Amino acid sequence: MNRNIDELRTLMSISANASESEIMEAFDSIANYLKNYCVIKTKDEKYRILDFEFYFFNQNHQDITTHPRNSEALCWYINDFGGIDLNFESKVEVNNEPMVKKGFKTYSCRYKLSSDSYFGGILIRQIQRLSDKVIFDGPLKVAELFRTLNASHQLQDIPILIIDPESLEKLEFASPQRHNILGSHKDITKKVDYNLQSCFEKVDDSERADLINSLQKILDKESTNRCYRYCWAGLKAK
């Protein structure tokens, strides 16, 4: 099959009403691309993606650990923790009316969940520079590629994702669980409440309960049918 970036972009355009099985199938196809065909290219170097995690929310897959965003497919996204995501096509209603604080208008951004909401991205956890095999381990190390961009013009040398299987040796990948998915909360209910309070307009009690139940089901499935994270087998998964 002739692999190309447009096919990957189509795979990254998961709809608001896609079923869970369709989402899992898309994850699997996208993972095959990232493991075996894609590299990140800068002006002077190429980098292989060695560890990545899937995050996606829609009405049939309510993974509320996913950061809300609005984006076309295949855009880079600096997430709330300073790491780099590769975005799915994402659409969610946003209220960015300024807040008045101490007499000044300040920027505020609150997202509104609905049956039409769909958003997400792929967190890049580890990459390897192909020229010397140096590994950048952890989302903040990966973000070093995006640290310094020219402030004087818009034609910047931003890293891009390209199809380049000839640069990649064959590697075996494992599928561990996503790293530290609940963060410091260690509890699904607390994690859901934290994300809702941090990013979203208030939801009613029944919606909150649905989000808690949905996340529990996702994490239960992830523990047995691991298809949310892929890392090369030489990495000791954290």
Model regions: which residues?
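A cross-family signal for N-terminal binding/gating loops and helix N-caps
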Residues: 1-238
